[in-house]
Amino acid sequence: MSDIIQLLPDHVANQIAAGEVVQRPASVIKELLENSIDAKASRIQVVIKDAGKTLIQIVDDGIGMSLTDARMSFERHATSKIKLADDLFSLKTKGFRGEALASIAAIAHVELRTKTENDEVGTCLKVEGSEVVSQDAFVTPKGTSISVKNLFYNIPARRNFLKSDNVETRHIIDEFQRVALAHPNISFSLLHNGNELFQLPITNFRQRITNILGGKTNEKLVPVEEDTEIAKISGFVGKPEFAKKSRGEQFFFVNDRFIKSPYLNHAVTASFEGLLKDKSYPSYFLYLEVDPKSIDINIHPTKTEIKFDDEHALYAILKSSIKHSLGQFNVAPILDFERDSELDTPYDYKNKEADAPQVEVDRNFNPFQNEGSSKTQFSGGTNFRKDKPAEWESIYSGMQSETDTDIDIRHIEFESEEVTGNLFGAREEQTEKSTFQVQKKYIVSTLKSGILVIDQHRAHTRVLYEELLKNITVSSAVSQQLLFPLLLQFNSHEVEMLKEIKDSLEQTGFVFSSIKKEEVEISGIPTLISESEVEILLEQLIADFEKDVPDNGFSQTDLLAKSLANSMAVRSGTLLNSAEQQHIVNRLFACKEPALSPFNKTVFTTLSVDELDKKFA
């Protein structure tokens, strides 16, 4: 038998390696930015075209490279960062494997211009598909400029897997922000298709966070400081009242390197226990300095996962330091002596004029409406007519008729709490209760064959989901125009997300006047929601669209309807009167799929008389 094992050619091996290192344009940005930082650059400019698919250019004022080093930098495993295996445990640089440039050059057209301070002229090197096309002397300033064009030009399948420009731009912004936050001592700029997205001067940590996420971020931050033998912790956490629906503003940096750590994230979340609203996530920007010998970063191609020698101790220190900072903030205001006076002007309550009282008008009030109207009103402002009795009512006639069991529902003691607001705007009917609530979570009704138990939140979600989906698919969504446009503040990441789903949002009734860098202007909203709910709903939408669920086959329209319905539905823990309970039950069984919520969760269950008899046997 002849030999069949062969050594792969370098260009094939480089293409295979590129699959690990370069997954999308954002991966190229990350690798090249880290190279510039290792080159001791104080100013770095990033230029991209068509979300990096056509051009990615990084220009820095670092130390540059000699003629020989420029050529060697494109060889596999050629690096200036380490020489021995032991050097891996004392790393202070971003790169060390010598794979990035070789991998990038294998799948793109690369042009490198570089010059050291001592050289009179620089070097211009062109590489295409791992092959050096030319190497010439070139007049260029000190530093390095590297251009990556036509990414994945020789791997069409990989290029076809790239997402839309909006999605790829969002990933680029994410990587750019992570690097920029870790290095406030370096000036960064980002241009996309000639438009400036970021211009970040050299500053301190707090100012850099504010410059990236917006001017109002500064007032939301609580400083965290702790210095121990295991680690030095510094940075900021967001105040609990400013917690968000998404995890977009959560950053860990270890020795100036962005990392992802579910374990340390749990420590932060645990320190906010009892302070956050349901399904809200705190913002944090935490910098950890540890001995390089106590960590291992060589466990993942992206270097975002790190192993710590004493992870449990670090968990305890982190949790304790954040709790201390939050406690200090709650007891008395924190005096920040490093605060930059140019960030913002604090409120001066002594000299501030009182705001004019706001008059709230009920747009749905109709003095001529018959009190016995069959319409039922949701909090969002839309009226839903009570349908004629559906077929299910004849099947489950026990819901509206007197129960045939020995227990008289009229003599059950209901909760004596008053309903603070009538969810549907109709008077509670002074009739016999055919439904009642359990723990303000479940709606219980009697059947001829037993008992029906309904999850009120899931049921209402199903009702709203089908209503929204119908409006969107038949293009019948109605928009209510606002007298004064809403101006909402979002960070760059969230703005890019809104741009991505803007068309689908407009199908639900939203009207966007403009979407700028950190501000969104809305002149119209769906009739199902009120102005006060818009910002919360959009935050939840962004959070839902950020979740990358592999087996999620729903379209943007379905996901929008699901997210809006889930946000608008009545929550568990809400006290409902009989009319409200009955309305949800009636509308639920008029749905196409009443048994399951839009998230495939059980909406109701039944308990037969036979099952009850067995319980008392």
UniProtKB/Swiss-Prot annotation:
Q: Which CDD domains is this protein grouped with?
A: HATPase_MutL-MLH-PMS-like, MutL_Trans
Task: Please tell me whether the keyword Protein transport is annotated for this protein.
Answer: no
GO CC annotation, single: mismatch repair complex
| SMART domains per record | DNA_mis_repair, MutL_C
GO biological process terms, alphabetically, are:
mismatch repair
According to the UniProt record, which cysteines are disulfide-bonded?
A: none
Molecular function terms from GO? ATP binding; ATP hydrolysis activity; ATP-dependent DNA damage sensor activity; mismatched DNA binding
Q: Which UniProt keywords apply?
A: DNA damage, DNA repair
Q: Which residues cross the membrane?
A: none
Pfam families found in the cross-reference section: DNA_mis_repair, HATPase_c_3, MutL_C
Please name the NCBIfam families in this protein's record.
Answer: mutl (TIGR00585)
- Protein family according to the UniProt entry: Belongs to the DNA mismatch repair MutL/HexB family.
Write out the function statement from the record: This protein is involved in the repair of mismatches in DNA. It is required for dam-dependent methyl-directed DNA mismatch repair. May act as a 'molecular matchmaker', a protein that promotes the formation of a stable complex between two or more DNA-binding proteins in an ATP-dependent manner without itself being part of a final effector complex.
> Which PANTHER family does this chain map to?
DNA MISMATCH REPAIR PROTEIN MLH, PMS, MUTL, DNA MISMATCH REPAIR PROTEIN MLH1
This chain's protein is named DNA mismatch repair protein MutL
The organism of origin for this protein: Christiangramia forsetii (strain DSM 17595 / CGMCC 1.15422 / KT0803)
Origin organism lineage:
Bacteria, Pseudomonadati, Bacteroidota, Flavobacteriia, Flavobacteriales
Q: Which gene encodes it?
A: mutL
